[in-house]
């Protein structure tokens, strides 16, 4: 945040959200370059212009924009526009990268003012993406139905631009954004294919998409709060009771006539909504009929108010006790864990059957093996094969690559309740590594293992850094019984691993 305060001397622009002059400042493109140091910035890897960031190209771009009198033109006349010349793609990509930094300034200034102690309007409805993990652990097992939603994309680029009008009250900046979009993007292929999105600056695209998603989410949250007829007091203090929700149903059924005014203490009226990338889930304790109503609410809201075409096939209503939810790279479901308790009372004994709901998170082994098969680590049946493209590397590099992949998968799927599928993935990677080394040394797997021994591959099953960290915190008894390894451990950085989340 300090870099914005140092470089961005907005003065009047700060009060009126007038951001258009910033596109003529060189430090904006320097900030865009700094944002992309660890990621592949498009104009840094542009073919034909070198891979280095050139301040001379930025100066030429600013001079051309400053001298251009008719910058905003229609998309049909873009081919005759002398503004970009033979470097049209490069300049367009640089403008979109700089504009991605500019549109984030109003939001960054709010964070700066909040750090200085100023009052900032807060939203009590929206939470961080990291709240998914406590939701899965605490509340997911107490829900009945889930609505799995594939969020549609806007059918026109103008819808994305209009979403910014409430945040950026600067007509010139919005016109520049339209010009940048229409200059080098085809309207029919920009939104849906991933390769078309790669042409456009990803940072700006996701900012526009999230701004648009914020609009219909605010309306949905208003409808959700209005649909709750009971008081929205949180029941989080009761979640530690094992059979709390079972007691709720009993109390509501038996004492509803006598304690009508106190039922809000026991009911949880909220419907939980989670959005991640292009997917969303709506989970609730309601019946399937009410979930079906929410489905048509979504369809009407998107089609008639946001002009996004959505088919009913993009919605799936599943009962958590019978179906698994494919979300965040896990197959999550709620299973009944039966338990039998024998109670002795004087001379009589009773057998009580209890069924406790428990969260079950499993690894999608079929899709994960399919991903390994596409990467040439195994065949379609899951049998390990050699990796011939890595055979030219040294033995240590080959082992390090396989171990790194294995540990990343273990790190991501540490939240799984069943580790047997993870052991199978480790087996595939382990013997794929052995076959690759044997192929390099022109030997068989049996002869290679007999000559070197199998101890050098124990790195696949040795203690990771995370497990070593937990061994220093938790008592040693947990590790002698290996209970900690069987339990779920959620790491907050797994939401950044898009290759596993979008494995489909």
From Swiss-Prot:
One of its GO terms (cellular component) is chloroplast. It holds the Pfam family MatK_N. Keywords: Chloroplast, mRNA processing, Plastid, RNA-binding, tRNA processing. One of its GO terms (biological process) is tRNA processing. InterPro entries: Domain_X, Maturase_MatK, Maturase_MatK_N. The keyword RNA-binding applies. It is found in: Plastid, Chloroplast. One of its GO terms (molecular function) is RNA binding. PANTHER family: MATURASE K (PTHR34811:SF1). Belongs to the intron maturase 2 family. MatK subfamily. HAMAP family: MatK. Usually encoded in the trnK tRNA gene intron. Probably assists in splicing its own and other chloroplast group II introns. This is Maturase K. It comes from Pachira aquatica. The lineage of its organism: Eukaryota, Viridiplantae, Streptophyta, Embryophyta, Tracheophyta.
């Amino acid at each position: 945040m300090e870099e914005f305060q140092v470089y961005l001397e907005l003065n009047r622009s700060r009060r009126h959200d007038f951001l258009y002059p910033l596109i003529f400042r060189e430090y904006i493109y320097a900030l865009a370059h700094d944002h992309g140091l660890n990621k592949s910035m498009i104009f840094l890897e542009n073919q034909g212009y070198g891979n280095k960031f050139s301040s001379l190209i930025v100066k030429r771009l600013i001079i051309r924009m400053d001298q251009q009198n008719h910058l905003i033109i229609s998309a049909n006349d873009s081919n005759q526009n002398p503004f970009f010349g033979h470097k049209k793609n490069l300049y367009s990509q640089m403008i979109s990268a700089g504009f991605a930094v500019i549109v984030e300034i109003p939001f960054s200034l709010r964070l700066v003012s909040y750090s200085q102690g100023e009052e900032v309007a807060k939203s009590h409805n929206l939470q961080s993406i990291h709240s998914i993990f406590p939701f899965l652990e605490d509340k997911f097992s107490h829900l009945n139905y889930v609505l799995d939603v594939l969020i549609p994309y806007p059918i026109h680029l103008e819808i994305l631009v209009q979403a910014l009008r409430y945040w950026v009250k600067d007509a010139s900046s919005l016109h520049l954004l339209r010009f940048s979009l229409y200059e080098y993007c085809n309207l029919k292929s920009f939104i849906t294919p991933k390769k078309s999105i790669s042409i456009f600056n990803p940072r700006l695209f996701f900012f526009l998409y999230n701004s648009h998603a914020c609009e219909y989410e605010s309306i949905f949250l208003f409808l959700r709060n209005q649909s709750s007829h009971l008081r929205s007091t949180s029941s989080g203090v009761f979640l530690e009771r094992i059979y709390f929700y079972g007691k709720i149903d009993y109390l509501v059924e038996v004492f509803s006539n006598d304690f009508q005014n106190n039922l809000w203490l026991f009911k949880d009226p909220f419907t939980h909504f989670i959005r991640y990338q292009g997917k969303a889930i709506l989970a609730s304790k309601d019946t399937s009929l009410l979930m079906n109503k929410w489905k048509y609410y979504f369809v009407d809201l998107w089609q008639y108010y946001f002009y996004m075409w959505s088919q009913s096939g993009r919605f799936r209503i599943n009962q958590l006790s019978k179906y698994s939810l494919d979300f965040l790279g896990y197959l999550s479901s709620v299973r009944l864990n039966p338990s039998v308790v024998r109670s002795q009372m004087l001379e009589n004994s009773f057998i009580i059957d209890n069924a406790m709901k428990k969260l079950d998170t499993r690894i999608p082994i079929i899709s994960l093996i399919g991903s390994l098969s596409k990467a040439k680590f195994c065949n379609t049946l899951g049998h390990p094969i050699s990796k011939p493209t890595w055979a030219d590397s040294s033995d240590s590099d080959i082992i390090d690559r396989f171990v790194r992949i294995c540990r990343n998968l273990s790190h991501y799927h540490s939240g799984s309740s069943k580790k047997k599928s993870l052991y199978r993935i480790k087996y595939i990677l382990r013997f794929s590594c052995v076959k690759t080394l044997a192929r390099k040394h022109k030997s068989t797997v049996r002869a290679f293992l007999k000559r070197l021994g199998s101890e050098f591959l124990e790195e696949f099953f040795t203690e990771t850094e995370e497990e070593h960290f937990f061994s220093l915190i938790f008592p040693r008894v947990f590790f002698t019984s290996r209970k900690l390894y069987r339990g779920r451990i959620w790491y907050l950085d797994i939401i950044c691993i898009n290759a596993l989340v979008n494995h489909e």
